[in-house]
A protein has these predicted regions:
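Positively charged n-region of N-terminal signal peptides that target proteins for export
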Residues: 1-4
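Catalytic nucleophile loop of clan PA
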Residues: 57-58, 207-228
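Flexible, gly/ser-rich surface segments that form the specificity/activation loops bordering the active-site cleft
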Residues: 28, 116, 126-130, 148-200, ...
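Conserved hydrophobic positions within beta-strands
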Residues: 56-58, 124, 189
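C-terminal cap/linker of serine protease catalytic domains
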Residues: 21-31, 82-108, 115, 147-149, ...
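Bacterial N-terminal signal peptides
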Residues: 7-16
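A conserved glycine-rich beta-strand in the N-terminal activation segment of trypsin-fold
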Residues: 28, 40-72, 214
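Catalytic-histidine neighborhood of serine endopeptidases
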Residues: 61-129
Length: 327
C-alpha cells in the first residue's frame, strides 16, 4: 500500500513538473520541425570592419493593406550597426541614435539539399542594449509579404508565464552562423529565474553555439517560450523567457509584435517609435560595453575584418576586445 501511495505521488510530481516525455507522433513532430524552419532566420550585421551573425524569429502582422514581417532577436546581434550622431536642435546639442540595415537570410532546401538563400534588408524598429537594458531588438523586413508563417508566442497568465523545469524544448538557430543555419536541437528547461546583471533568464540544456543568439526556444508543439542569449558550455545555456519579452514590449508599446490578438499600429506610428530607450544617457558607439562575461558569453558569431582573406571567428565579449585591423 505504501509503495502504491509513493508511486502515485511520484507520478503526480512528474506530471505537474513537466518531466513526462511527450508523445508526439512522427508526423506531428515533422510538421513542427518544418514550421520552426520556416519562422527561423539568420541575421547578419555587417559594418565596415566586422561582420556578426546571429539568429532571429519571424512574426507577420497586417499593417494597413500590407503584410509586414518583423523579426525578434537579441540587441547585441545588431549592436555593431549602431551609430551615434551629434546634432544641434533648439540651440542645444543632442545625440541621435541611428542603425544601419541588417540582412535577414533565409536558407532554401529542396529534396534534402541546400539550393540557395534569400537575403532581405531589415531596419531596427526597437533596441535595448545589453548593458543598460533587456538586450532585445525588434526588426522590420523592408520587403512586403516576406514570411509565409509567423511565430506563436507562449503568452499566458498561468503560473506567471513560467515554463516548468523539465519541460522538453526545441531550439532552432544559426549555430556557427550561416553555415549552421536553421539547425535544430533539443533539451529541457533546467532552471528558471536565474539573475545575471540584474535581469532574469531561464536556463536550458538545448545545444547552442556562437550564432545561436536571438534564436527561438520552443515547446514541442512549436510555441515560442524564449530566446537564446548566453551560454556556458554544452548543456548550460541562458534564454530570455517570453514573460520578460512581454514586460519589455508592454513598456515600449510594441506588445502587438508578440500578441497578434492586439491591433497593430499604422506604419507611420511604427516609424515614429524611438529606436532606443534605455532610461540612461545615450552612449557613444565606441564607448566600452560590459559584454565580457567569462562564465556566460554571448552566443554570437563574429568575423573580424571581413575584408581579410582569412576570416577569424570568436564569441563576442565586448567591443574593446575585438582586435580589428583598420586599413
Amino acid at each position: 500500500m505504501n509503495k502504491l501511495i509513493i508511486s502515485t505521488g511520484l507520478l503526480f510530481l512528474l506530471v505537474t513538473t513537466g518531466f513526462t516525455q511527450s508523445k508526439i507522433n512522427p508526423t506531428e513532430r515533422q510538421k513542427v520541425a518544418d514550421y520552426l524552419q520556416e519562422i527561423s532566420v539568420t541575421i547578419r550585421a555587417q559594418s565596415e570592419y566586422s561582420k556578426s551573425e546571429g539568429s532571429g524569429v519571424l512574426i507577420s502582422r497586417k499593417i494597413g493593406d500590407e503584410n509586414v514581417t518583423f523579426v525578434w532577436t537579441c540587441g547585441h546581434v545588431v549592436d555593431n550597426m549602431r551609430k551615434v550622431r551629434s546634432v544641434i536642435r533648439g540651440g542645444s546639442p543632442k545625440k541621435l541614435v541611428e542603425f544601419g540595415d541588417v540582412q535577414i537570410i533565409k536558407e532554401l532546401v529542396e529534396e534534402g539539399r541546400r539550393v540557395g538563400e534569400i537575403k532581405m534588408d531589415a531596419s531596427v524598429v526597437k533596441y535595448s542594449d545589453a548593458d543598460d537594458g533587456e538586450d532585445l531588438a525588434l526588426l522590420m523586413v523592408r520587403a512586403k509579404d516576406y514570411a509565409k508563417d509567423s511565430a506563436n508566442f507562449h503568452i499566458t497568465k498561468a503560473n506567471h508565464g513560467i515554463v516548468p523545469i523539465g519541460t522538453e524544448l526545441f531550439h532552432v538557430g544559426s549555430l556557427l552562423g550561416q553555415r549552421g543555419s536553421n539547425s535544430m536541437t533539443a533539451g529541457i528547461v533546467s532552471q528558471v529565474g536565474r539573475i545575471l546583471g540584474k535581469v532574469e533568464y531561464d536556463q536550458t540544456t538545448v545545444t547552442a553555439f556562437p550564432g545561436s543568439s536571438g534564436g527561438g526556444v520552443y515547446l514541442q508543439n512549436g510555441k515560442y517560450v524564449g530566446m537564446i542569449v548566453r551560454g556556458a558550455g554544452e548543456g548550460f545555456n541562458l534564454m530570455v523567457p517570453v514573460r520578460r519579452m512581454e514586460r519589455w514590449a508592454t513598456e515600449h508599446d510594441i506588445l502587438w509584435a508578440l500578441n497578434p490578438a492586439l491591433e497593430a499600429p499604422s506604419m507611420k506610428e511604427i516609424k515614429a517609435l524611438p529606436v532606443e530607450t534605455t532610461g540612461e544617457e545615450v552612449k557613444d558607439e565606441d564607448e566600452e560595453k560590459s559584454f565580457k562575461d567569462k562564465q556566460f558569453p554571448y552566443m554570437i558569431r563574429i568575423i573580424k575584418d571581413s575584408k581579410e582573406p582569412e576570416l577569424k571567428e570568436l564569441i563576442w565579449t565586448k567591443s574593446s576586445d575585438i582586435d580589428v585591423d583598420h586599413k
